[in-house]
C-alpha cells in the first residue's frame, strides 16, 4: 500500500508542476524568470527569433510577451542554448568534476557526455561509481557512457578487467546514456564474442554505442556499423568522415588538447550533412581550459573559419542532444530546459551570462555551488591506488640491451630506432620504464627512447594511457628510481627530478590521475614542472608529460612500452 501511495504522491507532485508550467505558458501565472526582449537562436527553423523567453520550474515554457517574478532585459544580446560536449574524459582536466564544472560553466557548457575509462582502468567499477557520485547535482549535467575497453588491450596491466557483466547494472542509472567508444574495432569486425556481447548488452538496455575507429573503411566499416556503432570522434580527414556519414554514423568533430580536427572537417559544417555533426573535445587539459575555453572555443573557431553561426551553435548543442536522446535540451522552445548562454554577438562571442535550469550561474562572476557528497569508502579507495614496493636503481638495470623507441617530431607515432644497452644523454638515448602500480606485481618493463631530449635527471608520471601505471624516463637509474618513488609517495602525479631533488611536481592523488586542488593551482604547478623539464633538456617542441603518457599505449604504431617491455605494435610482439 505504501508503494502505491508513494507512487501516487510522486504523480501528484509532477502533476502540480505540470499544471503550473501550463498556467505560466498560457499567461495565467507569472514566470519564475523572463528574459525580456531576447534575440535567440532557433535551431529548428535555423534563424534568429525575437521575443521574451519565459521559464518556470526550470523549463522554458513560452516565447512571446511574458511577465515574471524576475525579469532580465537582454536587449541587444544573443541567447543560445546551453552547450554540450558530446565526448570527453573528465579526468583529462586533471581536476575533480566539481573543479571541472567551475571551469566550463563560464564558457557556456551545461551538459557533457563523459567516458570515465581513465579512472575505470585504475579502480574498475568503483571508479565509475566514484564519478557518478562526484557529478551528482552539479550545475553542469554530466551524462555517462560506460567504458567499453578496460583494459584497452590484453597487453596492459590495469587495475581492473571489465566485461559486460561488470558494468551491466550501471545502465539503470538515470545519467547513463550507453556504451563508450568501442576502441576494439578489430574485435567487433572479427566477431569476438567477448567484445560484441558488450554491444548486445547495451542494446538490450536500449542505449547508444559510441565508436572509435580511425580510418576504418569498406566491409570492415560495414561490419562495425552493422554491429550497432553509430558515431565516431576519430575522423581526421574528410574522406574518413564521408565514408562514415554515408553509412549512417554521426560525426563528432573533435577539437581538444591532444587532437584538433575542426579545420580538416570544416566542409561538414557547410554541407547538407551538418545535422549529423556535433562538437566534442575528447581530452581537455588545464591550460587549454583556462586559456581557450571549452565548446565556446570550438564555436568561435568554426565561425572564424566560415561556418554559419547558427550551424555552429546547432553543432554545439542541438545535434548532440538529439543523438543522445536528451530530448529536453539543446534548443530554446517550450518544454526544453532553461539552459542559456547569453553573448554579445557572433563576431566577438563574449559570454556575458549563463543560466542552468533557469538559475543564473555566471554573469562575470561564477555562482558558488557545493561539491557532491561521495561515499567515504570510495574517497578512501580513490586515494589509495598505489601498491608498489620501494624502488632502487637496481630495478632499472638488468644488464641487457633493449629496443629504442624513436620519437618522431610532431607525431604521436614512433619508429624502431634499433637497440641500446645503456643511456647516453649526449646522443639523446634515454632509459624508459613502466612500473606496474595496481597490484604490487613488481613488473617493470625496460627500454630506451630517442628524441625526448632530456640531458639530466628524470621525469615520471602516473598518467600513462590507458592503464595508468608509472612511466619514467631518465638519464640515470638513480633519478628514475627517485622520481618513481616520489610518485608513489604523493599517491600519484608528475615529478621532475635531478640528483634526488624534486624540481617540479603536480600531485594527482585521486586515483593517480586527478587532483584535489583547483584548476588554477594544478595548471600553475603543471607549467612550472614543464619549465623544469625543459631546463633539463627536454625538447621544446613536445609536451614533456603528454608525450610520455602515450608511450605506454600499445595500440599506436610502431613501438610502445608496457610493464613487460618494448612492444612492436605492427608485429604484435615484444622485442
Regions found by a protein language model. Give the residues of each.
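Divalent-metal coordination cores built from histidine and acidic residues
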Residues: 2-24, 101-208, 272, 502-507
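Structural motif
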Residues: 32-33, 70, 110-112, 140-143, ...
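Histidine/acidic residue-rich metal-binding segments in metalloenzymes
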Residues: 127, 161-180, 187-252, 259-279, ...
Amino acid at each position: 500500500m505504501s508503494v502505491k501511495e508513494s507512487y501516487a504522491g510522486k504523480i501528484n507532485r509532477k502533476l502540480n508542476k505540470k499544471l503550473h508550467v501550463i498556467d505560466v505558458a498560457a499567461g495565467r501565472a507569472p514566470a519564475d524568470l523572463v528574459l525580456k526582449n531576447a534575440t535567440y537562436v532557433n535551431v529548428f527553423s535555423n534563424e534568429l527569433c525575437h521575443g521574451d523567453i519565459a521559464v518556470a520550474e526550470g523549463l522554458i515554457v513560452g516565447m512571446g510577451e511574458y511577465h515574471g517574478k524576475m525579469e532580465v532585459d537582454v536587449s541587444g544580446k544573443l541567447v543560445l542554448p546551453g552547450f554540450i560536449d558530446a565526448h570527453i574524459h573528465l579526468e583529462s582536466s586533471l581536476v575533480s568534476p566539481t573543479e571541472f564544472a567551475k571551469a566550463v560553466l563560464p564558457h557556456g557548457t551545461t551538459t557533457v557526455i563523459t567516458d570515465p575509462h581513465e579512472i575505470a582502468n585504475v579502480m574498475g567499477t568503483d571508479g565509475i561509481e566514484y564519478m557518478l557520485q562526484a557529478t551528482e547535482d552539479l550545475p553542469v549535467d554530466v551524462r555517462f557512457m560506460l567504458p567499453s575497453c578496460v583494459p584497452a588491450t590484453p597487453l596492459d596491466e590495469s587495475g581492473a578487467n571489465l566485461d559486460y557483466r561488470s558494468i551491466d547494472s550501471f545502465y539503470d542509472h538515470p545519467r547513463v546514456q550507453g556504451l563508450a567508444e568501442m576502441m576494439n574495432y578489430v574485435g567487433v569486425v572479427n566477431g569476438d564474442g567477448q567484445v560484441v556481447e558488450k554491444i548486445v548488452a547495451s542494446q538490450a538496455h536500449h542505449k547508444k554505442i559510441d565508436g572509435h575507429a580511425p580510418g576504418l573503411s569498406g566491409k570492415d566499416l560495414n561490419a562495425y556499423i552493422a554491429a550497432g556503432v553509430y558515431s565516431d570522434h576519430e575522423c581526421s580527414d574528410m574522406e574518413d568522415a564521408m565514408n562514415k556519414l554515408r553509412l549512417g554514423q554521426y560525426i563528432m568533430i573533435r577539437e581538444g588538447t591532444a587532437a584538433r580536427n575542426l579545420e580538416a572537417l570544416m566542409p561538414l559544417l557547410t554541407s547538407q550533412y551538418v545535422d549529423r555533426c556535433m562538437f566534442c573535445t575528447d581530452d581537455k587539459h588545464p591550460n587549454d581550459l583556462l586559456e581557450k575555453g571549452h565548446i565556446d572555443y570550438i564555436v568561435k573557431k568554426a565561425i572564424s573559419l566560415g561556418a554559419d553561426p547558427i550551424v555552429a551553435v546547432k553543432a554545439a548543442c542541438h545535434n548532440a542532444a538529439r543523438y543522445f536522446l536528451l530530448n529536453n535540451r539543446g534548443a530554446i522552445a517550450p518544454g526544453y530546459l532553461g539552459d542559456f548562454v547569453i553573448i554579445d554577438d557572433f563576431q566577438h562571442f563574449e559570454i556575458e551570462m549563463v543560466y542552468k535550469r533557469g538559475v543564473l550561474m555566471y554573469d562575470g562572476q561564477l555562482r558558488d555551488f557545493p561539491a557532491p557528497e561521495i561515499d567515504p569508502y570510495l574517497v578512501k579507495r580513490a586515494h589509495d591506488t598505489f601498491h608498489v614496493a620501494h624502488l632502487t636503481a637496481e630495478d632499472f638495470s638488468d644488464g641487457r640491451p633493449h629496443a629504442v623507441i624513436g620519437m618522431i617530431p610532431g607525431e604521436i607515432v614512433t619508429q624502431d630506432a634499433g637497440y641500446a644497452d645503456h643511456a647516453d644523454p649526449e646522443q639523446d638515448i634515454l632509459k624508459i620504464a613502466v612500473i606496474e602500480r595496481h597490484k604490487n606485481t613488481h613488473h617493470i618493463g625496460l627500454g630506451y627512447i630517442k628524441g625526448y631530449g632530456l640531458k639530466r635527471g628524470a621525469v615520471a608520471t602516473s598518467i600513462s594511457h590507458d592503464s595508468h601505471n608509472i612511466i619514467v624516463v631518465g638519464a640515470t637509474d638513480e633519478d628514475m628510481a627517485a622520481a618513481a618513488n616520489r610518485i608513489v609517495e604523493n599517491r600519484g602525479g608528475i615529478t621532475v627530478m635531478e640528483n634526488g631533488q624534486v624540481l617540479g611536481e603536480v600531485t594527482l592523488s585521486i586515483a593517480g590521475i586527478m587532483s584535489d586542488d583547483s584548476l588554477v593551482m594544478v595548471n600553475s604547478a603543471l607549467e612550472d614542472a614543464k619549465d623544469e623539464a625543459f631546463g633539463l633538456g627536454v625538447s621544446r617542441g613536445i609536451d614533456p608529460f603528454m608525450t610520455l603518457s602515450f608511450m605506454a599505449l600499445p595500440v599506436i604504431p610502431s613501438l610502445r612500452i608496457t610493464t613487460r617491455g618494448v612492444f612492436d605494435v605492427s608485429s604484435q610482439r615484444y622485442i
